[in-house]
């Protein structure tokens, strides 16, 4: 019985801990309202530095940024990396993302 308990405890602590995943739409609010990835938060590129800590307080969480074509999301990725976010992905343009979308 004791060995089974130790084995179960060892398994729990050996499982990887996954950080949360956040989708950030860096387009202007009007574009976000027309269509966006389901669950995404709208933080326009020019506001990323000021607002990201509220939306994503843990810098080890996965942050996926997107825009219309990938240029602004590339800039956002650079900004977030410079701010210490460790898992930032440029997801490119909205049309290229294979995730459920919400249309306004």
Curated annotation (Swiss-Prot):
It is found in: Periplasm. Its main location: periplasm. Its EC number is 2.8.1.1. Disulfide bonds: none annotated. Residues 1-19 form the signal peptide. Inhibited by thiosulfate above 100 mM, particularly at low cyanide concentrations (<5 mM). Inhibited by sodium sulfate or sodium chloride at 0.25 M which gives around 50% inhibition of rhodanese activity. Addition of sodium phosphate at the same concentration results in about 65% inhibition. Sulfite strongly inhibits PspE activity (1 mM sodium sulfite resulted in more than 50% inhibition of rhodanese activity). The active site is at residue 67. Induction: By heat, ethanol, osmotic shock and infection by filamentous bacteriophages. Expression is positively regulated by cyclic AMP-cAMP receptor protein (cAMP-CRP). Expressed at higher levels during growth on glycerol, acetate or proline as carbon source relative to expression during growth on glucose. Residues 20-104 form the Rhodanese domain. It comes from the Bacteria. It catalyses: thiosulfate + hydrogen cyanide = thiocyanate + sulfite + 2 H(+). Keywords: Periplasm, Signal, Stress response, Transferase. SUPFAM superfamilies: Rhodanese/Cell cycle control phosphatase. The record marks 93 as: May be important for providing the necessary conformational flexibility for enzymatic catalysis. The phage shock protein (psp) operon (pspABCDE) may play a significant role in the competition for survival under nutrient- or energy-limited conditions. PspE catalyzes the sulfur-transfer reaction from thiosulfate to cyanide, to form sulfite and thiocyanate. Also able to use dithiol (dithiothreitol) as an alternate sulfur acceptor. Also possesses a very low mercaptopyruvate sulfurtransferase activity. PANTHER family: RHODANESE-LIKE DOMAIN-CONTAINING PROTEIN 15, CHLOROPLASTIC. Catalysis proceeds by a classical ping-pong bi-bi reaction mechanism, whereby a covalent enzyme-sulfur intermediate is formed on the active site cysteine. This is Thiosulfate sulfurtransferase PspE. It comes from Escherichia coli (strain K12). The lineage of its organism: Bacteria, Pseudomonadati, Pseudomonadota, Gammaproteobacteria, Enterobacterales. The gene is pspE.
């Amino acid at each position: 019985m004791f060995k089974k308990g130790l084995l179960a405890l060892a398994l729990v602590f050996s499982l990887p801990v996954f950080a949360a995943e956040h989708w950030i739409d860096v387009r202007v609010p009007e574009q976000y309202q027309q269509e966006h990835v389901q669950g995404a938060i709208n933080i326009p590129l020019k506001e990323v530095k000021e607002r990201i800590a509220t939306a994503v307080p843990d810098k080890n969480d996965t942050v996926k940024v997107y825009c219309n074509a990938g240029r602004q999301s590339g800039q956002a990725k650079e900004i977030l990396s410079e701010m210490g976010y460790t898992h930032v992905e440029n997801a490119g343009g909205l049309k290229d993302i294979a995730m459920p979308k919400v249309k306004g």
